[in-house]
Amino acid sequence: MINPTRLQLRPRFLAAFLERVFGLRTLSEIYEQRPLGVNPKDFLSYVIDALGVSNTLKQEENLLEIPKEGSLLIVANHPLGGLEGIVLANELLKYRPDLKVLTNELLRRIPELKELFVGVDILSQRASKSNFAGIKQIHSHLRSGGAVLIFPAGMVATYEREYGRVQDRPWKRLVGQLIKRYQCVTLPIHVDGRNSTVFYAAGMIHPRLRTILLPRQLSNKNGFNLTLTIGRIIPSEEIRLVRDPQAITDYLRVSTDALEQLSLSVSKKMTHTIKPIPVNNSLQLEKEVEDLKEFRLIEHDEFDVYCAPYDRLGLVIEQIAISREITFRDVGEGTGFSKDSDEFDSHYLHLFLWDKINLKIAGAYRVGFVDEIVSTHGVEGLYSRSLYRYDDSFITKLGAAIEMGRSFIHPDYQRRSVSLNLLWRGIGRILVSNPGYHTLFGSVSVSREYSDLARSLIVDVLLSNFKAREFSDLVEPLTPHKIKNRVWTERMLSELANVKSLGKLIGRCDPGKSLPVLLRHYLALAGKIACFNVHANFNDSLEGLIIVDTRITAPKTLKRFMGAEGHQRFMQIHKLQG
């Protein structure tokens, strides 16, 4: 039998020289010493041992979720060009003996792997024709309920000057087409590894040079440990609302790249000690709240909602500032001081939720009538002006507006939906009681508890689908958020206008998370995002400038926090239908 790793050249001394240069000699020796008559799984195990390679599985428990039958598509990044296919196939065959691997034609030339590997030609000028048979075989295998491992980039990763890192080439829409057609379950896997600097330098000269050097990158891995991070199964229903094949492919790439981010992303927690109000002051706090009866907006079971000016709050404003810091620090934000207060507090109203049973501040908003603040303190008197650059033309464009910000729900009350609902009923009362105002605006944060990948995804999706374009020339962030590694296309961004789908992908980036609650709430009110700012003094939280013109909010939504009577009055004042 002809050794498939040897060059069929004459004279033989030239072939031997080239085999040594390109690393084929080592591979040839390994092949000559192979055990005969073994199945693909045993052959792969032999090759891995002979190469001196080991591997580590992270989140190995996710492999147990692989369905034993039915169409399954495994996707992975392609940093090495050969070794990852061998190691992954060896692991995956334990769970799906019916596995097929879509790989380059060079690996398929090995007789022992013909049953396992489906080859595609990445070198020939007539690749599209020669690849047809391989792609057809993959379609047939998935149609019959088989499992397929595919590297959607199609080629080994390259050094990208723009991002200053080695990363996959754009993923091909083929995987999206396969999922859409066969409703496959998908398993994302991230491979951590890289080839030599010479390899990437050669690729920058010409892609064919990179391909020629692939055998050496396989043969020089003695002692190399390959880390594989196994993602969670993605059921076809999860991406049912994503219709475009390229958008589906991008969704899978983000899910795969996120597996690398999971081990790299660490939220920055504050370390200073917070000094709470002494317990013996609770009764004094209760007394001061009772003195605010004229500012009470809502009574509901154990909660009351108040909106009062700073100079009437005394101990209450101190407790609000402490609760702010506790809440923000709990999600990786915060000022780092014992309480979160600033020079803006004194000329804003403070809307707060009071737990009259446990004598605690359950949540709060800072509220300011824009025209009043600007007439007294100028544009710089608005808190948002400390985060975004704008002038009077922005204020004029807003119209009759109320600035809202510094909102929080204390951690003890975050699992109770009534907390946010009551605060928003309070906001509804403010709007109805001040009929000249119709627009709410202010900053809403995405904390450092979210990974860089998730934060960039949120920024791109929201600015693509929910941008306040009429304000684009009037406001800009003081410190813009920079997306370091954009791996998605415009097609995916437009498909993720569905907030539910966006939330699921964020959960892939950061397990257990979704789009922040307040952002979801504002978008449900037909809110738009003007821009995002990085708040360096607030532990680098990401601050989106949200603008909500309540005149275009769905009537059903407005009724929920204004009440039927208040909503009717609001509609009449602003001459709205609905």
Stretches with model-predicted labels:
Residues 93, 98-131, 136-138, 142:
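Conserved nucleotide-cofactor-binding alpha/beta core module
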Residues 271-311:
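Conserved N-terminal entry element of GNAT/NAT acetyltransferase domains
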Residues 343-352, 514, 539-544:
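A short helix-loop-beta-strand connector motif used in the catalytic cores of GNAT acetyltransferases and
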Residues 96-103, 348, 354-380:
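Carboxylate/His-rich catalytic cores and anion/metal-binding grooves
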Residues 132-277, 488-496:
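Non-catalytic C-terminal accessory region of glycerolipid acyltransferases
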Residues 297-350, 354, 360-363:
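Short amphipathic alpha-helix that is part of the acyltransferase structural core
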Residues 1-78, 85-87, 94-98, 114:
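Membrane-anchoring hydrophobic helices of lipid-metabolizing enzymes
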